Amino acid sequence: MAKRIKDPGEKSRIRATIFDKLNRRGKWGPIHTSKENALKGIPSHDIGIAKDILEEAIKEGFLVPKHTGYGDHVSLNFKKNGEIMAIIASLLAG
């Protein structure tokens, strides 16, 4: 079970960090990476909530799931490019 977030901006920061990492690595559409790699670099005390945020992003359509023989992978959704870039820009602005 993930910890409860006291600061609502913390959830946005973690989401933007995940999206920024995938964007910088070019993980759009058919180019995917494992869920574990998407979460690398997140502080260990935030991993639980980051996993929940990753699952929420899949349900909301920001991330596209890809089931492979060696685990579940994700990539950024081209159709939500504008929204994803706005979320990343909010991270860089703050």
Placement of each model-derived feature along the sequence:
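Residue-level marker of regulatory loop/turn positions in helix-turn-helix DNA-binding domains and
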Residues: 7, 11, 31, 46
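Short alpha-helical segments that sit at the start of domains
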Residues: 1-24
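A short, conserved structural fragment
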Residues: 58-68
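Short acidic, hydrophobic short linear motifs in intrinsically disordered regions
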Residues: 28-42
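Short, amphipathic alpha-helical interaction segments positioned at domain boundaries
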Residues: 79-94
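Short amphipathic alpha-helical interaction segments
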Residues: 43-59
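Charged interaction/catalytic cores of defense and host-pathogen modules
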Residues: 52-54, 65, 74
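Minor-groove-contacting beta-hairpin "wing" of winged helix-turn-helix DNA-binding domains
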Residues: 70-76
